[in-house]
């Protein structure tokens, strides 16, 4: 992890400026590719393959193990092993079995995070690009003032080695009630992570993403990892099987950290992607068939070009149907968005959102 001294006056501002995901996470990116599947009595999408997206950048010994898994997954896809109506869900289940419940592997992946778009970095909400510097500058004052106004709910603890464990408990409450903090939400349940991955409405093309983390809560190198301490105010976090990665640990002066902060968290980023390669092969095959019947190359290309736009529209429809299909299957396994909100205020908000006429205004339950 990054070993740097931060300005004591405004450490959050400086941390945001230098933060890089790769300084904290050793990420192997996997793509699950799908393709729009037109025709009567067909599922509207087809899973084509699983592949490694950043193979040329990976130095981790985990790579060879993953390559073996990918080979078996692709064989299952090729042989149409998965049930016709639920192809993607069962592929996810098989991926979970290999990465999470595999007795042949010493250390499996035990924490997860779902994000609706692969372009989003693994970064706590306080440090995201849509947050003003003023918030980071004023954060301590905001926290201190809230603790003064609501002493029965919140206690202020400064950012220091002596107070960090007490502070992170209070930060988890602030995040629970909607304030952006230095905590990154994760969960011990991959199906809950899937709910978050699918939480946003499909109004443009996005690549839903699941993260898998190897976190040993008893190892010094994972001290950035925080389990939630249950109390009367955090029912929602407990329902979500929640935990956090606390980046206050990365901001503390290095002499105060009795741990190996050079250790990065082994991570897999699983991205659902439209298969552009399959599209180009389909278009080329269409062009070739027109050439075979005597059309000129220019005429053949002109004739086929509109098909690319049609596939783009079909792709958006396919993604929307994939989301609905996965959510329906999660409901069959008794995982539902409403269960993520056991506390009174959030449950009321969620129920109200289901009756909004404007779907774009529905409650966004993405991880903070």
Features from the language model and the residues they span:
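Catalytic-core elements of nucleic-acid end-processing and repair enzymes
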Residues: 1-368
